[in-house]
Amino acid sequence: GVTNKRPELDGEIRTTIDQTAWTDEVFSMKRGKMELVASGTHSLLSADGTPLWLVQKGKFAYRILPEYTREAFVTCETRPTDWVKRNKVNEKKQGLPSEARILRLWANHGQRPVDDTYGYVVYAGRQIPSDELPFRVLQNDTLVQAVCSMDGKVVEAVLYPGNKGLQAEGLSLSASAPCAVLIREEAGEIVVSVTDACMNAALKGIRIVLNGREIKVPMPQRMF
C-alpha cells in the first residue's frame, strides 16, 4: 500500500531492505553461480527478470519477490562521514574515520506510486540459498500477509485490522481480532499459536476459525 501523497515533489519513494556496513565481498547469485558485485548501483533483477540472491560474505542473503516488487537495487559505496552532525559530542573526539563503506539494498516505487507493493526474502543459513524457495506466498497486502511451506505443514499469517480473513487453496482462516498466527503439523496433530498483534491488555481471547473449525485461544492476563 505504498502511496506518495505529495507526488509533485522531486524524488522517488524507496523502501529500505537493508543498510549496513560494507565489510567484505558482496556477491549476487543465480542458479548456484556466484558473481562478485562491484562498487556502484546494480539491479537485484537479472536481465531476463529473474531475481538474484544478494549476499555479503558471512552475512545474510536477500532476494526480492518479483511478483510484488517492480524494481530493487543494491549499492556498494564509500561515503564521507560527518560525526559532528550526528552528535555534537563528537567535536572533541579524535581518530574517527573520515569515510564509511556502506551496503544498501532498497525497493524503488518511483515518484508517483499508488498502493504499490514490495516483498523480499531473508536467508540466514550458511549454505548457498536455492533458487527454489521453500515456501509460497498466499497473500501479501495491507490486510493479510501469509506464507505456507511447500509441504503444507507450516502456515504463518499476520491478520491486520479490517481484514476479511484468508482464503487460499485448501485453507480458510479468520480471527476475531488482529493477530499473528502460526499453524504447524506435528506428529499428525495441528498446533496453533496466536499472538495479539495490537498488544491489547483488555483482550481476553482470540477466536480462530481454521477450515471451519473454531479454536478459542485465551490471551495472557495481568502480565504487565
Model-derived regions: residue spans:
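Extracellular structured ligand-interaction cores
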Residues: 1, 10-14, 49-50, 59, ...
